[in-house]
Amino acid sequence: MKVLVTGFEPFGGEKGNPALEAIKGLPAEIHGAEVRWLEVPTVFHKSAQVLEEEMNRYQPDFVLCIGQAGGRTSLTPERVTINQDDACISDNEDNQPIDRPIRPDGASAYFSSLPIKAMVQAIKKEGLPASVSNTAGTFVCSHLMYQALYLVEKKSPYVKAGFMHIPYMMEQVVNRPTTPAMSLVDIRRGIEAAIGAIIEHGDQELKLVGGETH
């Protein structure tokens, strides 16, 4: 069994990206499954091209994309991604698509095919905060999640894919003391726990409360 984990390069003026820094330190094997990490550019469409090339080479069973969500207080597996780019800032190549479909021939939205509630449960068992998120945003994170699930639908139906957002790492908030952050060690532990749940449960979701009132 093989798991491909992606993380973005720094963007938005940040010197580092906890997604990339965390996955670099992942073990090569988790719960008996082979784990490979991949750096992707924080660029619309190019990020998907890099992912597709690696999926073709590596032939993973699972794809877990990781992204930074500054301001979030917990690790948040994403439930859904919409077919819409609406960038509030430019990506790393100065692209800023506004109200643009990601794939004109794609579905209006795709749901994660990973066991997101099992992932949340596993992260919480490590003593770390986690919750299901119902919005992946409309920047490159959501773009890549959508593209991954589009590729799965069109070309690799045996693959299960999804996305998880993580908080800032502590180094990023030294001068922003009121901004939520988490140590890189804990972020990595949370990602490992999520991968463990993916391997254990596959696409068999747990029937747990994970919704919101608004």
From Swiss-Prot:
Reaction(s) the record says it catalyses: Release of an N-terminal pyroglutamyl group from a polypeptide, the second amino acid generally not being Pro
GO molecular function: pyroglutamyl-peptidase activity
GO CC annotations, alphabetized: cytosol
UniProt entry keywords in alphabetical sequence: Cytoplasm, Hydrolase, Protease, Thiol protease
Superkingdom field: Bacteria
Active site: E78, C141, H165
Keyword field contains 4Fe-4S: no
Positions of disulphide bridges: none
One record GO biological process: proteolysis
Enzyme superclass (EC): hydrolase
Subunit note: Homotetramer.
Family: Belongs to the peptidase C15 family.
NCBIfam families reported in the protein's UniProt record: PRK13197.1, pyro_pdase
Task of the protein: Removes 5-oxoproline from various penultimate amino acid residues except L-proline.
Protein name: Pyrrolidone-carboxylate peptidase 2
Source species: Streptococcus pneumoniae serotype 4 (strain ATCC BAA-334 / TIGR4)
The gene coding this protein: pcp2
